[in-house]
């Protein structure tokens, strides 16, 4: 009995093998002139027609490649098969495992003195000086606003009849309320902010652009009736208001008191030393370009004002 079952089983195996051979020959014949592309293979439909389907299984040979999607594949076939299955375009970036990419996030904004900071410092200085005004008495002469300014100017001038930024800062530091601008959480940045705002005040009335104030320029800067103009930053034929930001690589530039101020971070790259040098040069050129746009805009504005 068992011999009959064995013979029947062998017969069924033989039939299946013959059919498989026939299907393989038929598939080879039908798909002979069909090209399906990477990640696909030709298959025969129930109607006996050729069609292209995603490869069912790749050969397990190990030759890792890194795809353009940042994923490592066992071999080229697996990469193209994944592209077919997901319907996405994936190319071989390079041979071998994908290297971990260092994420470079934009740096924090640079420490800057905005127009609001500058104007607040100026308001506090004027308030302090006005509090020292002494009206003339019956038998004594008081001190008016100009005389008080003259007194401080002479006290902090080093003898050249000009106040530079360090002398101006020493003058402002005489009043703790005036100098106590605390925009940033740490004292180091707030100290830097004070110096930047002093520079911004000097720029307000520095008519000959020597970064020093004569007494007349000093008087104009702190004149209570003087309204500081709102300056904007220029870039690519556009003007940007105080506080506007733009990014270049991993650095951030901020418009402050009419000037672009940028961070000076170096971005990670494959060649660290070369990447840093290149980035620094690019950053310098970029800031120079920003300032050039600003100078052009200022000249155009002055010409337009004269024509009016």
Swiss-Prot record:
Gene Ontology terms for molecular function: calcium ion binding; heparin binding
Tissue-by-tissue expression: Overexpressed in synovial tissues from rheumatoid arthritis.
Disulfide bonds: 31-42, 36-52, 54-84, 58-77, 66-98
Alphabetically ordered keywords of this record: Disulfide bond, Glycoprotein, Heparin-binding, Phosphoprotein, Repeat, Secreted, Signal
Any one GO BP annotation for this protein: regulation of BMP signaling pathway
Domain EF-hand: 144-178, 193-228
The keyword Secreted belongs to this UniProt entry's keyword annotation: yes
Pfam families: EF-hand_FSTL1 (PF23564), FOLN (PF09289), Kazal_2 (PF07648), VWF (PF23244)
Superkingdom, natural source: Eukaryota
In-chain residues carrying the UniProt-annotated modification Phosphoserine: 165
Domain VWFC: 233-287
Residue ranges of every copy of the Kazal-like domain listed in the record: 48-100
Known glycosylation sites: 144, 175, 180
PANTHER family: FOLLISTATIN-RELATED, FOLLISTATIN-RELATED PROTEIN 1
Name used for this protein in its record: Follistatin-related protein 1
Lineage: Eukaryota, Metazoa, Chordata, Craniata, Vertebrata
């Amino acid at each position: 009995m068992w011999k009959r079952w064995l013979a029947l089983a062998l017969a069924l195996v033989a039939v299946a093998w013959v059919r498989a051979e026939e299907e393989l020959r038929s598939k080879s014949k039908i798909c002979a002139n069909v090209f399906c592309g990477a990640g696909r293979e030709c298959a025969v439909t129930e109607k006996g027609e050729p069609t292209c389907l995603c490869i069912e299984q790749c050969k397990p040979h190990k030759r890792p490649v890194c795809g353009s999607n940042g994923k490592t594949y066992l071999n080229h076939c697996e990469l193209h098969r994944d592209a077919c299955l997901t319907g996405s375009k994936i190319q071989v970036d390079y041979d071998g495992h994908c290297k971990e990419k260092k994420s470079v996030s934009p740096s924090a904004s640079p420490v800057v003195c905005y127009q609001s900071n500058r104007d607040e410092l100026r308001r506090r200085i004027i308030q302090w000086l006005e509090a020292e005004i002494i009206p003339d008495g019956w038998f004594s002469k008081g001190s008016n606003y100009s005389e008080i300014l003259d007194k401080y100017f002479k006290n902090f001038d080093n003898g050249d009849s000009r106040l530079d930024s360090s002398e101006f800062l020493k003058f402002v530091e005489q009043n703790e309320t005036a100098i106590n601008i605390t925009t940033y959480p740490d004292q180091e940045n707030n100290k830097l902010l004070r110096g930047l705002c002093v520079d911004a005040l000097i720029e307000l009335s520095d008519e000959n652009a020597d970064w020093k104030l004569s007494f007349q320029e000093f008087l104009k800067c702190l004149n209570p009736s003087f309204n500081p103009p709102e300056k904007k930053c220029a870039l690519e034929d556009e003007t940007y208001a105080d506080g506007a930001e733009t990014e270049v690589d991993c650095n951030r530039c901020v418009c402050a008191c009419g000037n672009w101020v940028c961070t000076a971070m170096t971005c990670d790259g494959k060649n660290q030393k070369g990447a840093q040098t290149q980035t620094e040069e690019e950053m310098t050129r970029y800031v120079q370009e920003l300032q050039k746009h600003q100078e052009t805009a200022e000249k155009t504005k002055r010409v337009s004002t004269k024509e009016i």
